[in-house]
Amino acid sequence: MADQSNNMIIEEVNKGLNPGTIVLLVVATLLILFFVGNYALYMYAQKTLPPRKKKPVSKKKLKREKLKQGVSAPGE
């Protein structure tokens, strides 16, 4: 008799999914969808958007770089 009552309790606990498991599955699914969506958007943007233009380098920076290399800047 004691064995049957213990088995019934265990079976009742195992019926259905644990609420914690459901929450974990939902959160994991949302995270995976988020990352897959981000990756898809990134790949789409790489194909369709034109490449970014580089910022123009200031004359002051050019002068400094040339002085570092040992080449005299023009106009000096």
Swiss-Prot record:
Q: Which domain of life is it from?
A: Eukaryota
Q: Where is this motif: Nuclear localization signal?
A: 50-55
List the record's Gene Ontology CC terms alphabetically.
nucleus
Query: Among the record's GO biological process terms, what is one?
Result: regulation of DNA-templated transcription
- Location in or out of the cell: Nucleus
Q: Report what the protein is called.
A: DNA-binding protein S1FA1
Family per UniProt? Answer: Belongs to the S1FA transcription factor family.
Q: Does the keyword Aminoacyl-tRNA synthetase apply?
A: no
- Taxonomic source organism: Oryza sativa subsp. japonica
Which residues fall in a compositionally biased region of kind Basic residues? 52-66
Task: Give UniProt keywords alphabetically.
Answer: DNA-binding, Nucleus, Repressor, Transcription, Transcription regulation
Q: Which intervals of the chain are annotated as region Disordered?
A: 52-76
